[in-house]
Amino acid sequence: MAEYFSREIETAGRCGLAKGFVDPGLGFYYGNLQDSSIRIRHQMKTFLNAFRLRRLGWPVCNALPHAVECFGDEVRSAEPFFSVIAALGGTDLFRTHEVPRVHAMLRTLGVY
């Protein structure tokens, strides 16, 4: 993934963009990951490896998934849960619909 974004950052630079965010695109439809448990593990692995993308010199943005299949009626707990994993991986910008919950979680962790 880092190789791909390295090439994209070079292209952006040639087009005049000096700074932006690296966004691996989590939270969107995965046609190749239909099994929700496999998809969620892939997303968590990507969150935990955000620090590798930060080495490219741009901050990392991650969209936090709902994971309805796993969280069911407690779906509003999913994004705060994933925010912990993303924070541990070094995510800089968290895309969330649960701003107060995620903010409280990150403040409690003392990382942001």
Task: Tell what function each PLM region has.
Residues 1-10, 14, 27-112:
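Active-site-adjacent loop and "lid" segments of alpha/beta metabolic enzymes
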